[in-house]
């Protein structure tokens, strides 16, 4: 049947900021949905708060609202836009929760809920309704009890027993859940889970930890045609969230009858839910036909992004078309260009997904993996065998693996699921543990352990007898040339000459049964036939950014996609190399050719040798891609390839990173920089710090996201840093700068063609120097800087860009102290603020940069710096609610996972929007707790006065109450933590505090601060830790009480 003609306009809800449990997969699915709906003549209204996404580009939807994802705000958009339907399943858990809220408040009268019906949302997300539905259709679920209060826990424990699994209703990435082994743990987890749940409901169920975890991605249309897209198997057994597990496709350890038993159950469940579109169903499987249905995601999910990339089947595109009435057999599979979407995909290769965890950033975090997610991103690898896919995935992670050789230590690591366990499996086998021993400790299916044992045996074979046959077999297993050289004792070039280049095979949805129109490729040594074809068009390779991690997020995928789009519009053939299954850049039709490969020198150079490339672009893929620039140039020269690094030269990139060279450049341009130096040893560091004067900012060179960056105040702290935080070498010194206290920091993003410079935007940070720029809120245009200061910033930006020889993007960070503008650093590459600037001012910086890198001149383009009449604020999302044990104090090392944008016509309202979009809802009524250091009390006075004038009550400890009283402000007394209860922690737990403003000066106040922040995070109370943010919050609260928020589309602000 044709699409529903009554659906002319659809509201699509995005997923908001990148956070643990909800990453870039929803930008990929939402962007695909926008294109699919518009192909059918449907007008799309998009609402999403995340400026770093492709879907919030002004050209992606017909109307784009970059607004907080709050039901009351979306209700106003619905009233204004009058959509015929709402599509919630592309916005992850956020989209489903908001749709349910909107329906409950009556905002969806006359608006059709598309794809996932309201009944399916309730039955999929409400744990009690889901259990009842499964019982009705005869599908087994774990024994369980639903609780909505702590009084019910003893009864629940008596029914379920221990260990018990806790699953809150309507939460993201298992948030608020976990595994309890006794009543005290059960009480602690359930108390948090009830607070996280939208309906204050938690399921406590019997543990099936140790069973196999199997997932099916299924699709259904209005005609009741159902297909399975992909079956996936978790290497980790039940007890670890699927987002935290190593996952393999296709399912390899079930017999055919077992596979069809679960497949049939999955189809039965999607029919019972009446979902029209995609659905993810998770099973626990014990064997002997015994299984349990664990949960259903009646929407596009992280697993569906993986299934889509693993098979080539465009799940979000097909689900969007089904949502407006099309049948599966009426939708064309755009990968083959011939088959209908009703054909089930088949694959003739092995896909492995491995999560990327942030524990390299958070040393104190609890690394235990449970039913609540902690990873920030993931990589995907494809091979002809499990061993090859495993090793390519591990190579893609780009993490340092700590090896263990002590058996007692290994057994302890294996006994508890952590991020270290998968790597420890290899070490355990190297140390002689048997498969049975390891299987007994870990409950991992022996099949997977056998594959790892094959890899370990190959390591031994390479060492013992590295003949040609052994080396070739190692390549089939996925070993890199460098690894083979290390094990065999041979030179890398000798290995290269023996094994040659890999072949490249297609991912085409149909196991090569039909020719593919838009294929993507993976390398293998397990086949002889190469499926890459050649064209005569001018080809450019663009390196993507790999897995999402703190410091390198979706912003770089945005830049990659914009560069691809610009070059394809100009007629170039564009090839992308990336390994992240969540992203738009790895969508089947983003580039002319996609290589799903590790982002290493060897893997990239292999691709370059397979075709004639005009050039390679590294500056859009973040620090990892930029770090490849110099070695890749050397490799191109060594192999005598007819290609080049496009844009800014590797030497210019090195000049910006090399502190000594960069300082010489700034001196020659008469541009001020804080006193600084480089240290190649501990003694040099002491001497440099003494010359500069404490406090100093110390950091390693060539890193992203401020990794291992600290402010140190004396020799003792510096000694600790040099011995514990960094490894200094002759090629990687420690950089030491005078720390500019109370300075205002600025970021500038610009494009340079070697002759001219266009400034995209000047961003003023809300927080002062000392907080990493990636963790600071920032605003366009600057709010507190004089025209003279801004003129200096513009002048220095042009001089530095031209002095470095930038061709493409450049980001420069400044600090303003008094009337002096200091340059902190310059990064001649894409930055994490490029998407925010582009959305704020309407200039497509990444597209302009890509064209400049191909030789176009800025003078021939219709762009210039724009003065905007509105205000845009970028705020960050911090992961503390997902990572117990993490220090919540902000500093020079980046901790945020994502960002949001608030846009309005004054700073207060824009900041208010950004705050609530970042889940830090500023109160219009209630109690504010203020506890700041003595040096800030005079400055916090006006903040407190503004709060009281707006009807908020102030709570503080004795010293602050007295200080306020002497100055005419009434504050209520609350005990210090050390003075016992009732104190601020008790008030937070009781829900009596609406906002926390707290900083610290010494070890005791820092300890108190950490306790307050941890309870505030656990109970969802907004908190502020800097004076500047408190001032901004007061202005925001005052502004929204005086005037309503402006709800207008992005196109309205930027004149589209």
Curated annotation (Swiss-Prot):
Name a Pfam family for this protein.
CPSase_L_D3
Which positions are annotated as binding Mg(2+) 4?
825, 827
Which residue ranges does the record assign to the MGS-like domain? 920-1056
Specify which residues bind Mn(2+) 2 according to the UniProt entry for this protein. Answer: 295, 297
What are the boundaries of the region Allosteric domain?
922-1056
According to UniProt, this protein's pathway is: Amino-acid biosynthesis; L-arginine biosynthesis; carbamoyl phosphate from bicarbonate: step 1/1; Pyrimidine metabolism; UMP biosynthesis via de novo pathway; (S)-dihydroorotate from bicarbonate: step 1/3
Any GO BP annotation: L-arginine biosynthetic process
SMART domains referenced in this protein's UniProt entry, alphabetically: CPSase_L_D3 (SM01096), MGS (SM00851)
Which sites bind ATP 1? 127, 167, 173-174, 206, 208, 213, 239-241, 282, 295
Binding-site positions, ATP 2? 699, 738, 740, 745, 770-773, 813, 825
Sites binding Mg(2+) 1 sit at: 282, 295
- Know the name of this protein? Carbamoyl phosphate synthase large chain
TM spans (from-to): none
Please quote what the entry notes about the protein's domains. Answer: The large subunit is composed of 2 ATP-grasp domains that are involved in binding the 2 ATP molecules needed for carbamoyl phosphate synthesis. The N-terminal ATP-grasp domain (referred to as the carboxyphosphate synthetic component) catalyzes the ATP-dependent phosphorylation of hydrogencarbonate to carboxyphosphate and the subsequent nucleophilic attack by ammonia to form a carbamate intermediate.
Q: Which InterPro entries match?
A: ATP-grasp, ATP_grasp_subdomain_1, CarbamoylP_synth_lsu, CarbamoylP_synth_lsu_oligo, CarbamoylP_synth_lsu_oligo_sf, CbamoylP_synth_lsu-like_ATP-bd, CbamoylP_synth_lsu_CPSase_dom, MGS-like_dom
UniProt region (Carbamoyl phosphate synthetic domain), positions on chain: 533-921
Alphabetized NCBIfam families for the sequence? CPSaseII_lrg, PRK05294.1, PRK12815.1
Tell whether Transmembrane helix is among the UniProt keywords: no
